[in-house]
Structures are given as structure tokens and as C-alpha cells.
Regions:
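Short hydrophobic core segments
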Residues: 1-7
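Hydrophobic/aromatic ligand-binding patch that stacks against planar heteroaromatic rings
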Residues: 3, 30, 166
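Flavin (primarily FAD) binding-site architecture
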Residues: 7-17
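An anion/pyrophosphate-binding glycine-rich loop and adjacent beta-alpha core
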Residues: 30, 36-148, 200, 209-218, ...
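FAD/FMN-dependent oxidoreductases across multiple families
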Residues: 130-175
Length: 342
């Protein structure tokens, strides 16, 4: 009677991501193909400091708290650079830092920068960041003595399946919660540590709304058989895996942190060719990736500028609904409301 999408984001369509590799936008792609409303797919947030270690997917997250602790971003030759981009230096918000790192890497031809905490007390560093210390040490990096190689990575999708305050999508009896949904609460740039709003608060809203209307719905008498006419099984899966890698390469190169119409059009043309090659295959592993990437590029091409709206501004625009959202959020006492730099 009720279907709830909780399929996560689509960051695995990028070469570097902090998300699980199953985050290929499956649920969003299903709704997109079913003509449901998908919104703000261009609002993909990049975390500025993922551990740079070629071959690691997903990338290991180096928390922003390390910069709050006093970590300093430096180029590969050991020079600080954040003073060129923001007076807050390495303490600037994640979107500014991610763009700054991306710019430095492109101008210098580097594949990463460094985060330096070697000037901090070694024992204090180990105490505050034991997991990061152990992870880096396993790769031969002692963060109390060595710089940490970092690079931006796709981290969170602020867009997705458009839902209302009950987490209901534009398709009847279909709800979406968590990262696959687009609530509008995050605007175009989610703040740290508050993704639980969509995962918990909206899941609660979906449960209550669906239970209230459950008896009104009836089951379908029959589910039609899957129609695979005109498709075929690909006997060489290496071709599919290669296509998936091409999608990641295209998205990372042309639809990354900094975008232009020229880059987006190139990405569109290349993905269009790949889509034609793979459209005929049944049970295609990477089919969702194409749909998710296609949706992101389509919307980005139509967006003249990023519509970044802080939570406060969005709530003001919602009027009487704002109080309802705030009361729902406040009802979950374990949702973190303050950022602890340590």
C-alpha cells in the first residue's frame, strides 16, 4: 500500500566520494524515470578534506573538526594558501574551502593538498582524533609528524525526490526520506552534522502520515510481469564496469565543484553517447548512475546561479509551516544542534 524510498544519495557517480559505493542514486533514478518530480540535483556538496589515497573508494573522511582544532591547509610545497580566499583562513565554511582547494589543485596541476597539525601537541592530537591517527598510521602517515594529504570529495546531495512536510513525493503513496529526498531545509549547502533532520524527522513524519491514511488505500490486484522486450544480457561485464568508470571520470572532470556551461554541455554530450551504448542491456548495474548524472546536469544547465538559502530564510518563506518544522526538529532531542569543534 505504501512505498518509502530511503536509498541515499548519488555521490558514487564521482571518482572521489566519502559515501558508500552503493550510493548511485537508484531511488532518485526510479522516480525520475517514472516522471516524478526531482529537484535541486545540482546541489551536490563536496567535503573539502577527504584523505587522498589513490585506489581508496570510498575516501576516508578527515573531519572539519581538525581545522577547528588548528589544522592548516598547505600546498604540496608547504605554503599556506587560504589567505587568498577568505579572512577566516582554514576555518572558512566547507564550500569556500572546497573551492579554494580545487582552485589550487587546478592551477598547480596537483592532485591533492595537505592538512598540517604537526604544530599541535602530539598527545592531544591522538586523544582528539584517535581514528584518524590510526587510519593514517596504517598508510605510513604519522599525523603528529607528517602532513595529511587531502582532496575534496563528493559528500552529500542536498537535492533529490521533492517531498512535502509529510515526506510525500509527487507520486501517490510514495514517500522519500533521508538523502534521496529534497526537503529544501538545507538550501544549496548543508551545514555540518544536521543530515538527521531528513533521516529521522521526515521519516517520523512519513510514518505518521502513512498510518493515518493507510486504510484509505487498497492493494493492486496484479503486478504486471517485467517487460524486457528489446533488451539483452551483456556477456562482457567488463564493458559495463568500464562505462561506470567513464561516468565517474566525466562527472568529476566536468560536473565537479566549479562548473561552466561549456563543461556541463561536454558532460551531457559524453553521457548521452554512453547512455545509448548501454540502454539496450537488461539488469544494467550502472543504469541508475546515468539517470542520476543526467538529472544533475539537466538541472545545473538550467540554473543561472546557486540558490543558497539558509534554514532561517527557508523557514521564513514557509510561514505557518515553519513552526511545525521547528517543533518537529526540537522533538528529537538527540539531533545535534550545535557544532562541537572537537
Amino acid at each position: 500500500k505504501i512505498t518509502v524510498m530511503a536509498t541515499g544519495g548519488c555521490e558514487a557517480v564521482y571518482r572521489q566520494t566519502t559515501n558508500p559505493l552503493v550510493a548511485t542514486g537508484d531511488g532518485i533514478a526510479m522516480v525520475y524515470r517514472a516522471k516524478g518530480i526531482v529537484k535541486d540535483m545540482e546541489f551536490i556538496q563536496f567535503h573539502p578534506t577527504a584523505l587522498y589515497h589513490p585506489g581508496d573508494r570510498p575516501s576516508y573522511l578527515i573531519t572539519e573538526a581538525m581545522r577547528g582544532y588548528g589544522g592548516i591547509l598547505k600546498t604540496k610545497d608547504g605554503k599556506e594558501f587560504m589567505h587568498k580566499y577568505d579572512p577566516r583562513l582554514s576555518l572558512a565554511p566547507r564550500d569556500i574551502v572546497a573551492r579554494a582547494i580545487d582552485n589550487e589543485m587546478k592551477h598547480r596541476g596537483d592532485d591533492h593538498v595537505y592538512l598540517d597539525v604537526t604544530h599541535k601537541d602530539p598527545e592531544e592530537t591522538k586523544r582528539h582524533f584517535p581514528n584518524i591517527y590510526e587510519k593514517c598510521l596504517s598508510l605510513g602517515i604519522d599525523i603528529t609528524k607528517d602532513y595529511i594529504p587531502v582532496a575534496p570529495a563528493a559528500h552529500y546531495l542536498c537535492g533529490g525526490i521533492l517531498v512535502d512536510l509529510n515526506a510525500a513525493s509527487s507520486i501517490h503513496r510514495l514517500y522519500a526520506v533521508g538523502e534521496c529526498s529534497c526537503t529544501g531545509l538545507h538550501g544549496g549547502n548543508r551545514l555540518a552534522s544536521n543530515s538527521l533532520i531528513e533521516a529521522v524527522v521526515y521519516a517520523d513524519a512519513a510514518a505518521k502520515h502513512s498510518l493515518a491514511h493507510f486504510e484509505e488505500y487498497s492493494y493492486k490486484d496484479e503486478v504486471p510481469e517485467w517487460n524486457d522486450d528489446g533488451t539483452k544480457m551483456n556477456e562482457e561485464m567488463v564493458l559495463i564496469s568500464q562505462d561506470a568508470k567513464e561516468v565517474q571520470q566525466i562527472m568529476s572532470t566536468y560536473v565537479g565543484i566549479v562548473r561552466t556551461n561549456l563543461r556541463l554541455k561536454r558532460a551531457w554530450n559524453r553521457l548521452d553517447l554512453l547512455s545509448e551504448e548501454t540502454e539496450c542491456f537488461c539488469f544494467l548495474a550502472g543504469h541508475e548512475s546515468f539517470a542520476a548524472a543526467e538529472g544533475a546536469i539537466k538541472i545545473a544547465l538550467n540554473a543561472n546561479k546557486v540558490r543558497v538559502k539558509p534554514l532561517r530564510v527557508i523557514l521564513n518563506g514557509l510561514g505557518k509551516d515553519a513552526a511545525m518544522i521547528i517543533s518537529r526538529i526540537n522533538g528529537f532531542t538527540y539531533v545535534q544542534t550545535e557544532f562541537d569543534p572537537y
